């Protein structure tokens, strides 16, 4: 076979068009500074911001993950990517100590929206928002930027402003996305043969050189001659899938006129976990899944020449199911602890008669997923506000007075369904 090699030299000429324009467009960018909206170039405080359209480029069930790397000075730590579990940590330029808190103050549409959940953890509505309903996220970092919040802003402040209506014809936007989650790297465990050899080595140190596994067992593990008596099980591979699916469908309406401006959003997010699908294992269905429904309705109404009303309503409904059927089913910690601690030769996944392997109901992690039932958690979060603004131009041009009221409601319920198996 003859090989032909060709050396190709190419020259590329790049022409870059250069034009000059007035600086007015770039200087007209507005940024929120807590109590007002100001031209970005006029702000001397340490402030950074990101638009909601930029956040929407990252398809993730948790909005907090989208903020990572997009706001200088903000550190986002991810404790878990389990569907429906919000375990992020937020730090702005390190940690503060006011009241023992480390997280920044979260302000959504002018109101502080942090609450303590049933487990005593500090939570915020930010994690339940969708990028499509966010206008901008602004990070206030230094003392001059956070001064109006006093000690509460000691750890920095995150300002989130949701989208509102515009004086324009109706715009309808529909989005549909499908994505997949995949572990960055799965741990590799010893097979039964290597495990038995190392076990013999450790056993011999404390038992005068005696061997726990004999030659017959070692040969069976090595050659795989009897998968029931001498099993070799990769519990990660047996219990988990390679990928998890994500779905998102959204519809929003935006528009208005001189009297009424509106923004309405409907959104659905679905996320399945990495656990094996239970219908593939038994006749019961308790698949791990997470569903979230978001509704937003923001309206601005000019009641009269001087009086205007601003109505904000955001609703997030969550439904989470985790197989397991016990209190440990609140999350997957128990499952991962089990599959990491089980030796590969402990027992087969199924016995010769197709019953589940294991010496007790709690031993087989795959059986627990398929047969033990499920833990279901529901939450409802309502965030609403009404703001009235009266212009007082007759007293002083540009003078106005505003009053606002906010109502937040958070509901959390759960149910536990479990059963034994043979």
Segments predicted by a language model, with ranges:
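Secreted/periplasmic carbohydrate-active enzymes, especially glycoside hydrolases
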Residues: 1-2, 371, 421
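Short, small/polar-rich motifs associated with maturation and membrane association
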Residues: 1-295, 309, 357
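Transmembrane beta-barrel strand/turn architecture of Gram-negative outer membrane proteins
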Residues: 133-136, 146, 153-183, 259-348, ...
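Short glycine/proline-rich turn/loop motifs
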Residues: 229-232, 363-369
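Asp/Glu-centered strand-loop micro-motifs enriched in Gly/Pro and often flanked by an aromatic residue
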Residues: 236-241, 369-376
């Amino acid at each position: 076979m003859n090989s032909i090699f060709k050396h190709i030299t190419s020259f590329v000429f790049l022409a870059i068009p250069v034009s000059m324009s007035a600086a007015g467009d770039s200087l007209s960018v507005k940024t929120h500074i807590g109590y007002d909206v100001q031209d970005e170039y006029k702000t001397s405080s340490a402030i950074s911001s990101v638009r909601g359209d930029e956040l929407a480029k990252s398809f993730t069930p948790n909005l907090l993950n989208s903020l990572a790397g997009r706001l200088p000075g903000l550190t986002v730590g991810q404790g878990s990517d389990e569907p429906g579990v919000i375990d992020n940590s937020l730090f702005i330029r390190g940690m503060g100590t006011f009241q023992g808190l480390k997280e920044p103050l979260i302000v959504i549409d002018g109101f502080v929206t942090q609450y303590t959940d049933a487990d005593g953890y500090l939570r915020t509505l930010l994690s339940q928002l969708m990028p499509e309903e966010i206008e901008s996220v602004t990070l206030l970092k230094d003392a001059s930027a956070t001064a109006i919040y006093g000690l509460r802003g000691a750890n920095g402040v995150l300002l989130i402003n949701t989208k509102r209506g515009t004086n324009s014809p109706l715009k309808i936007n529909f989005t549909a996305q499908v994505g997949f989650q995949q572990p960055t790297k799965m741990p590799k465990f010893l097979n039964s043969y290597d495990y038995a050899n190392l076990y013999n080595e450790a056993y011999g140190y404390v038992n005068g050189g005696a061997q726990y596994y004999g030659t017959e067992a070692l040969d069976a593990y090595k050659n795989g001659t009897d998968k029931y008596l001498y099993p070799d099980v990769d519990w990660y591979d047996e219990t988990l899938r390679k990928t998890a699916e994500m779905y998102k469908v959204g519809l929003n309406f935006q528009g208005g006129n001189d009297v009424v401006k509106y923004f309405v959003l409907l959104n659905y997010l679905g996320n399945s976990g990495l656990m094996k699908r239970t219908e593939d294992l038994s006749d019961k269905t308790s698949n791990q899944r997470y569903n979230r429904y978001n509704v937003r309705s923001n309206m601005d109404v000019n009641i009269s020449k001087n009086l205007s009303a601003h109505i904000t309503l955001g609703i997030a409904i969550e439904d989470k199911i985790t197989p397991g059927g016990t209190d440990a089913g609140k999350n997957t910690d128990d499952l991962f602890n089990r599959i990491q601690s089980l030796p590969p030769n402990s027992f087969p996944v199924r016995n010769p008669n197709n019953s589940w392997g294991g010496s007790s109901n709690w031993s087989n992690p795959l059986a627990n997923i398929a047969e033990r039932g499920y833990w279901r958690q529901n939450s409802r979060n309502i965030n609403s506000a009404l703001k009235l603004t009266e212009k007082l131009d007759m007293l002083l041009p540009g003078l106005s007075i505003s009053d606002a009221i906010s109502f937040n409601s958070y509901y959390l319920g759960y149910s536990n369904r479990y059963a034994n198996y043979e």
